[in-house]
Structure formats: structure tokens, C-alpha cells
């Protein structure tokens, strides 16, 4: 009932809309099989997308096979959680055959390289996913498993980690940039975002490259922003024509106040936990 209420009140499917509802249990193993199946039917009735974390750890894969007699992806298939309106976070432990099926079913994968490395979960087979036609975007996971939530850092990490064992040509900078922009837009079903051209949403992230970090790297700025520097903050961020970051600072809020408030909350949490 609450999902129905939220969709009715907030979901806006129109192009350039800023608020959309997605039905997203944290993981398929945090809810019942019946609930997953009902969610899939309900989501399609309401024409909203679905998202969950899947195939993140080897333990998850083992648990699913032992308890249910099938892999996590097979479980998703059994409850209707596949298709162009579904995307999964992580997707590390898909088999080669499952990667092919993901492409055939037109599912999406949100790649979270820093979180995967931080937790030691594994490395997603992104080159294989892309070759199979799977839609791949780049994401940060969440604050519980990613301390910075810096998308540029995710891009830099993806650029480097997927060259191991596959060669430098398998993950060029522009492929990473495409995943982080048009790749995410494709997964979300929003063709009006993700690229700069007439008629598209005015979404821009601008970085200063006139710093010592980028000295000598101006032959290709796209290469420079990913290979050089330490994931710099955007100088300007514009979303739907609205400036949200100006001269490297968030607009509309006091960053120092947020900083101190967050530290106070963290200290209080540790006190209550007896740390």
C-alpha cells in the first residue's frame, strides 16, 4: 500500500522529470519469494522500474545454491525480476552463461568498483558484460560500504581494475565515461539525459584541468581527468539547468555546518555503541 501511495504521489514518468519511484528491496534475500514475485507484477502494472543488489559475494552465491538449489540470477528469473526494467547492483558472481543471458534479457548492472574492492567482494566482469550487450552504468553503492561516494573515483578505479588480465585496450577512458553517463541513462530508461547535445537535459559536470596535477596531459582532457589527479571535485555541477556546485562548493547549504553535524552524529552513535 505504501508503494502505491508513493507512486501515486511522487512518480513522474515524463521526460526531464526529477522524481521517479523505483521498487527496490535491498537484496532478494531480505524479503520472501512471494513478496518479490508480487513486487514484479505490481511494478509492471504501475510502469515503474525495479532494482536490487545481486551476485555481490561468493557467500551469497553459495547460500542461494544451498538453500534454493539455484543461482541468484536463476532465482530472479523465477520471480519475474529480469528484463529491461530491472537492474542489479554489483553483479560480480555471474557465470559466463549467465552473462550471456543477462544480455539476451536486456537487464542492467550498476557497477560499484570501489565498494566491491573495499569489501573484498570481487571484481565484476565488466568487459564481458559489455561484450554480451548488458547495459552497464557506474555507481557508488552506499555510505555503509563506500566512504567517499565519489563518482569520478569510481571511474578512475574502473578504468584501471578492468585492464588487469584483459589488456589496456579493453577499458579505454571514453568507454568508462560512456558507462558513467549514457550507460546510467540507458539503465534508468531516460534517453533525455547522459549526453551533451541539443534537446537533452542541461546536466553538466565541469572540472578544472589547469592545475599541476594535469601538467603535460592536455593532449586529451578525457584521458587526463581519469589518469591524472586524485578524483578532483567538480568545479561546477549543473542538473537540469540548476547550478548545484559552484566554484567547488555546494550551493544551498553550509558545508561546514553539515561537516560538524555529521561528526556529532557519528560520535553519538559510537558512544551509544560503547566504543
What does each of the following model-derived ranges do?
Residues 23, 53, 76, 88, ...:
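Conserved, mostly hydrophobic/aromatic
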Residues 96-97, 103-140:
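A conserved active-site cap/scaffold subdomain adjacent to cofactor or substrate pockets
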Residues 40-49, 81-84, 101-110, 131-136, ...:
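Glycine-enriched alpha-helix->loop->beta-strand junction motifs that scaffold or abut catalytic
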Residues 1-91, 97:
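Metal-coordinating catalytic core of metallo-dependent amide/deamination hydrolases
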Residues 58-70, 98-103, 120-129, 146-161, ...:
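Histidine/acidic-residue-rich catalytic or RNA/ligand-binding cores of hydrolases
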Residues 78-85, 127-211:
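His/Asp/Glu-enriched, well-ordered alpha-helical/loop segment
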Amino acid at each position: 500500500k505504501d508503494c502505491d501511495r508513493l507512486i501515486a504521489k511522487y512518480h513522474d514518468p515524463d521526460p526531464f522529470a526529477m522524481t521517479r519511484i523505483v521498487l527496490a528491496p535491498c537484496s532478494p534475500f531480505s524479503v520472501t519469494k512471494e513478496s518479490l514475485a508480487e513486487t514484479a507484477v505490481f511494478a509492471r502494472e504501475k510502469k515503474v522500474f525495479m532494482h536490487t543488489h545481486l551476485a555481490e559475494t561468493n557467500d551469497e552465491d553459495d547460500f542461494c545454491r544451498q538453500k534454493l538449489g539455484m543461482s541468484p540470477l536463476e532465482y530472479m528469473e523465477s520471480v519475474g525480476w529480469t528484463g529491461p526494467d530491472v537492474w542489479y547492483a554489483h553483479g560480480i558472481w555471474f557465470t559466463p552463461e549467465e552473462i550471456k543471458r543477462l544480455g539476451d534479457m536486456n537487464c542492467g548492472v550498476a557497477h560499484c568498483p570501489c565498494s566491491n574492492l573495499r569489501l573484498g567482494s570481487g571484481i565484476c566482469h565488466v568487459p564481458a558484460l559489455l561484450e554480451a550487450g548488458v547495459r552497464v552504468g557506474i555507481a557508488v553503492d552506499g555510505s555503509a560500504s563506500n566512504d567517499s561516494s565519489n563518482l569520478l573515483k569510481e571511474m578512475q578505479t574502473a578504468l584501471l581494475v578492468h585492464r588487469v588480465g584483459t589488456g589496456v585496450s579493453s577499458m579505454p577512458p571514453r568507454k568508462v565515461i560512456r558507462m558513467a553517463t549514457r550507460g546510467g541513462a540507458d539503465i534508468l530508461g531516460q534517453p533525455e539525459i547522459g549526453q551533451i547535445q541539443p534537446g537533452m537535459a542541461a546536466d553538466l559536470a565541469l572540472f578544472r584541468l589547469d592545475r599541476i596535477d594535469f601538467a603535460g596531459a592536455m593532449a586529451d582532457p578525457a584521458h587526463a581527468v581519469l589518469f591524472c589527479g586524485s578524483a578532483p571535485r567538480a568545479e561546477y555541477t549543473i542538473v537540469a539547468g540548476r547550478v548545484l556546485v559552484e566554484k567547488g562548493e555546494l550551493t544551498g547549504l553550509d558545508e561546514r555546518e553539515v561537516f560538524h553535524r555529521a561528526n556529532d552524529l557519528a560520535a553519538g552513535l559510537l558512544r551509544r555503541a560503547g566504543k
